[in-house]
Amino acid sequence: DVGSVVAELLLAFKMDVYYYSRTRKPEMESKGIKYLPFDELLQTVDVLTTHLHKNTPLMDCEDFKRFGNGKVLINTTFTAPYPLDVLREWLEEPGNYYIVDNSVSIGGTDGDIFNMPNVICPDMVAGQSMQSGVLLRIKVLENIRDYLSTH
């Protein structure tokens, strides 16, 4: 999964790496990645990355208070795992930064979050490339061919 890959990359830079998951990951812990309960994780880390399924809520107003200010939040999820008004309030505090790959999860390119100076949003899905687009189209055509050959 993406979170595990990110954690291992950060270890290569000799960073202290922590994670939270509903299920413990002994294989990650054996590599030196430390598990923390979510509340404790928020109070411990300076940078938090989220790697969740679409429409999975994670943080509310109280969680952002625990996370605090002077932090970086990175979201790789297609949707925001927190209410946008709560995210906006947190971003209005000094020293907070938000990095996200697509504008859909922050209300679009015409939304006020997209235009905030402490938000980095290239509005391109991180895994998107010309090659991935070609491969996707090939897969769609293969699926159509397979379906038509059996029906």
Locations of the language-model features?
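Rossmann-like adenosine-cofactor binding region
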Residues: 24-112
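C-terminal helix-to-coil terminal segments
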Residues: 97, 105-151
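Residues at the starts of beta-strands that form the adenosine-phosphate
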Residues: 7, 15-16, 96
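NAD(P)-binding Rossmann-fold cofactor-contacting core
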Residues: 11-30
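Glycine-rich adenosine-cofactor-binding loop
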Residues: 1-11
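P-loop/Walker A phosphate-binding loop and immediately adjacent motor/lid segment at beta-alpha junctions
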Residues: 9, 18, 62-72, 146-147
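General small-molecule cofactor/ligand-binding pocket signal
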Residues: 18, 34-36, 120
